[in-house]
Amino acid sequence: MAFGFFNSLKQGLKKTTAALGLAGLLSARLDEDLLDELEDRLLVADMGPAFVSELMERLRAEFKSKKIKQSSEVLPWLKAQLLAALKQGEKTTSSSSLPSIWFFLGVNGVGKTTSVGKLGKRLSNNGFSLLFAAGDTFRAAAAEQLQMWADRAGAQLISHREGGDPSAVVYDACEAAMHRKVDFLLIDTAGRLHNKKNLMAECAKMFRTVERHGAKIDEVFLVLDASTGQNAVQQAKLFAEVAPLTGIVLTKLDGSAKGGVVFQLVKEAGVRVRYVGVGEKIEDLLDFDEEAFVDAILAE
C-alpha cells in the first residue's frame, strides 16, 4: 500500500517538492541564512506560519546546541518531525456492536457524498452489508446523488423529502440498520456554511438521535478539500470545536500545489488524516500513509 500511495502522490505533489527544492538547499553549508531560506520554503509549501515557526524554533535550537552540525543532518531530522506531527492524533478503533456508525461532516463541495460512496464501495467489496443515510436534506438532488453511490456500492438508502429534518433521517436510518442487522451505517450530512452555534446544535441533535437508540458512533469524519488551502484550515478549526472528530478524509490532494496544508489540518483538527483522495476513480480513495506522504513531499 505504501509504495502505491507514494507513487500516486509523487506526481500530484511535484509543485510542492519543487517549491521546497531541498536537494539543492541542503547541499550548502548549514548556517542562519540556510535556516532562513528553509523557513521561507516551508511557508511557500503552505505548512502555515504557526506550524513552521514551531518547527524552525526547534531546528534552530538543535543547530545552536550543535546537536545538528551539517546540512546533511537536516533532512532526516525534518522527516522525523513531520512524521510526528501527522501522527499526533489518536487513531480510533470501532466498537464490536453493530451497526458500526460513521458520520461524514464538511461544507458543500468538498466531496462528502463521494467519500461516503467510495468508502462504502470498499466496505462492500470486503463483504460487509451497508446502509446509507441521506442526512443532507437541504441540497437539491443530494439524495439522488447518494442513491447513485448506494447502487454502485450495493447499499440500501434511507432518505426523506427535501428540506426535512436531518435528525429524522438519522432516526429512521438507525431503526432500519438495527432491524436489518447491517454491518455499517454511513451518514451523509448537510454542508451548508453555518455559524458555529447552529452547526453545534445540528450536530448535537443528530448525535443524540443515535444515542437514543443505544447505539455508539464509531467514526466522525471531517471531509476537507486539500486544494482549498487556508479555507480548509478554517473549516478544520470550526468543526473541531463543534463535533467529536475521529479523523479527516482529505480529497483532491492530487490537484493541490499546496500539499503542506496537511500539517495545518492535522494541527487544527487534532486528529489524523485517515483517507486521502488522489483521483476520480473509486479506488483512488486510499488509506493515508503518513510515512509515504512525508517521503513524497520531501522527495529530492
Question: Which stretches of residues belong to each language-model region?
Answer:
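Non-catalytic terminal/linker segments enriched in charged/polar, low-complexity residues
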Residues: M1-F104, L119-K121, N125-F132, R152, ...
